[in-house]
Amino acid sequence: MSKYTILDKINTPSDLKLVPEGQLKELASELRTFLVDTLDVSGGHFASSLGATELTVALHYVFNTPYDNIVWDVGHQTYIHKILTGRKDKLITIKKDGGISGFPKRSESEYDTFGVGHSSTSISAALGMAIADRLQGKHSSSIAVIGDGAITGGMAFEALNHAGGIKEDILVILNDNEMSISDNVGGLSAHFSKIISGGFYNSIREKGKEVLKNIPPMFEFVKKIETQTKGMFVPANFFEDLGFYYVGPIDGHNVVELVKTLRILKDHKGPKLLHVITKKGKGYTKAESDPIKFHHVAPSFHSGDAQSKASKPTYSNIFGNWICQKAAKDKRLVGVTPAMKEGSDLIRFSQQYPNRYFDVAIAEQHAVTFAGGLACQGLKPVVAIYSTFLQRAYDQVIHDIALQDLDVLYAVDRAGLVGADGATHDGSFDISFMRCIPNHVIMTPSDENETYHMLELGYEYKGPAMVRYPRGAGIGAEITDNLDIKLGKAKLVKKGSRVAILNFGTLLPLANQLADKYHITVVDMRFVKPLDEQMINQICQNHNIVFTLEESSIAGGAGSAVNEYIFANDLSKNITVRNFGLKDEFLTHGTKDLLLDYSNLSFNKIAEVLEKLLSHKK
C-alpha cells in the first residue's frame, strides 16, 4: 500500500481542490515525505520548500491557477509547487541533464508564471501581470510570494511603493522564516490577526471610514488609534504607510487558517500584504536545526550514504583563506558582500574581524557604492560577489567606482558555468560587461595559486580591479610564496609551432591536453585588461592559427579583445583566428562537462576544428 494515499490522487491543482479541507494537513505531511524520499535520490534545494509546504498547498487550493498568477521570488521554495502542478513524477530529474529546472521556468510549465533565480523580482512581476490582466478585462488574481530575505532587496521596495501608490489589486505574501511561532505570534496576536482579516471587520472598517471622513478630526483620531493598536501586535505601520492593507502575522504551517485567510483576501480589492511565519526546514528535524546546511542537499543525505565533499579546496576556500591572511597584515582591509557569506567563504573572516565585515543583505547596488564610500576614506574594500549578481550593480560599477577610479577589489565568484543551477546563475557575462569600462583591471587566474596571487595583486593595485574564478574545486595547485605575476603580462606555458592557444582562466588544463597531442603553443594570458599586447604580437608573428579559450561569453569576451587588437594592428593577414567560449544563448542546466562540450569547450570539439584548419593549411 502506498504511503501517499492523498498525494497519489493529485497531479494538478484541479485534483488538489477535490481534497476535503480536513485532509490538507495530512497532504502537507505526505508532500514533505515525498520531498525527502525524492531528494534523497536526486539532491536539490530542500529546506526552503519544506518551510513553504502549507503555504503552497493553500495557494493552489484557494486560487484558480494558472488563470490566477502566482509569482515566486528566487524559486528555491518551489519544489512543492512543481509537485502539485504536473511534475511530481519528474521531480527526481530536477537539475539533471534533460530534467526539470530547479527554479520556476515559463517554458517548462504554464503554472510557472515568471522565470526566476535572482532575488526580489516577484512583486514587480506580479504587479505588471495584475495591471496587464486588468487592462485586458481579465478578472484574475496576482500573487507575489517573497521571503523575509528577498524583501530586503531595493527592487522589492520600489515595487511595493508603486503598487501601494496606484492602489492596484495585488496580494503580496511575506514568507517570514526568520522567527519561530512563539507566544507573541500566537495568543492575542493570532486572535487579532483573525479579527482584522475577517469580512465583517473589513466591511465595518471601510464604511466607518467613509462616515468619519466627513468629520476630519474624528477620522484622524480613529485612524491613529487603529494604527497604534495594531502596532502593538504586528509590524503593520510600514506596509500600510506604503498603501497596503496588512494582515498578520499568522502561522504559515496552519493550512486551514491559511486557506481561510486567503479566501478572505481574495475578495478584498486593492494592494494587500499577508505576513506568514514559517520555519525553514519544517518537518525534518536536522533541517530545522541547521537550515543553512540543509538549504541544498546532496543525494543520499537522508539514507546516510551521502558522498563526501571533494578533498581539494574550492576557489571560494582560496579566497576565504587569502582575505583572512591579508586582513591580519593590513587593517585597511574591509570585506563587503550582498548576503553571500557562506557561498563566498567569508564565515571565518566575519568571525575573526566582525567590525571589518559588512553583509549588506540582498543589495548589490548598495554593496558596490558602499564600498566606494569606504575607499574614499582610505580603506581598501574587497567586494565578494557572484558573477551573476554583479550584473545587478552595473551602473554603480561604472558611475560610482570606475568613473572616480576608486580603490575597490571585486572577488567575483561563480564565474563561468555553474552546472545544475542553470542560466539564472551562470557567470557568463562578467568579462563582456566589465571589459568595456575604463579604469578596470580584469584578471583570469588559471588555478588556485594564480587566484591567490592575483587577489594579492588586485589588492595592492591602486584602482578598480576584478579577479574572476569559478565554482567548485580547482586542480589541486599548491599555494606558493614566489609566483611572479606582473600586471598585464602573460605566461608562455608551452612552446610549439604553427598553432597557439591563448587561454583565459581555468580551462588551461584543456589547452595543455591539446598541446600534448598537437605540439602547439599555449599561453596563459592571465589578464583580459590590460592585454599583453607584446605577447599577442609575438604569437601572431610565429603562428598560422590562433585559438582563444575562455569560459565566458564569446560576444564581447576575452577572445573579442584579442580580435580587436589583431585587426586594429593589421596582424590578421597570415593567420586564422578562432574564438572558443560560451555561445550567444542561455544554456540550460546540466552537468558542467556536458555544457562545456555543448559549448565546444571540450578536447574533441576543439580538436575537430583544429584538424580541419590544419588540413586546409597544408
UniProtKB/Swiss-Prot annotation:
Among its keywords, does the record have Magnesium? Answer: yes
Positions contributing to thiamine diphosphate binding? H76, G117, H118, S119, G149, A150, N177, Y284, E364
What EC identifiers does the entry list? 2.2.1.7
Name the SUPFAM superfamilies on file.
Answer: Thiamin diphosphate-binding fold (THDP-binding), TK C-terminal domain-like
Which GO molecular function annotations are given, in alphabetical order? 1-deoxy-D-xylulose-5-phosphate synthase activity; magnesium ion binding; thiamine pyrophosphate binding
Query: Which pathway or pathways does this protein act in?
Result: Metabolic intermediate biosynthesis; 1-deoxy-D-xylulose 5-phosphate biosynthesis; 1-deoxy-D-xylulose 5-phosphate from D-glyceraldehyde 3-phosphate and pyruvate: step 1/1
Q: Enumerate the residues binding Mg(2+).
A: D148, N177
Note describing how the cofactor binds = Binds 1 Mg(2+) ion per subunit.
Please provide the record's keywords in A-Z order: Isoprene biosynthesis, Magnesium, Metal-binding, Thiamine biosynthesis, Thiamine pyrophosphate, Transferase
Alphabetical list of InterPro entries matching this protein? Dxylulose-5-P_synthase (IPR005477), THDP-binding (IPR029061), Transketo_C/PFOR_II (IPR009014), Transketolase-like_Pyr-bd (IPR005475), Transketolase_BS (IPR020826), Transketolase_C (IPR033248), Transketolase_CS (IPR049557)
What Gene Ontology biological process does one annotation of this record name?
terpenoid biosynthetic process
- Catalytic reaction list: D-glyceraldehyde 3-phosphate + pyruvate + H(+) = 1-deoxy-D-xylulose 5-phosphate + CO2
Cofactor field: Mg(2+); thiamine diphosphate
An annotated GO cellular component: cytosol
Q: What class of enzyme is it?
A: transferase
Report if keyword Metal-binding is assigned.
yes
Q: Which family does it belong to?
A: Belongs to the transketolase family. DXPS subfamily.
Known role: Catalyzes the acyloin condensation reaction between C atoms 2 and 3 of pyruvate and glyceraldehyde 3-phosphate to yield 1-deoxy-D-xylulose-5-phosphate (DXP).
Q: How does it assemble?
A: Homodimer.
NCBIfam families annotated for this entry? dxs, PRK05444.2-2
Name assigned to this protein = 1-deoxy-D-xylulose-5-phosphate synthase
Q: Which organism is it from?
A: Francisella philomiragia subsp. philomiragia (strain ATCC 25017 / CCUG 19701 / FSC 153 / O#319-036)
Q: What is the lineage of its organism?
A: Bacteria, Pseudomonadati, Pseudomonadota, Gammaproteobacteria, Thiotrichales
Gene giving rise to this polypeptide: dxs
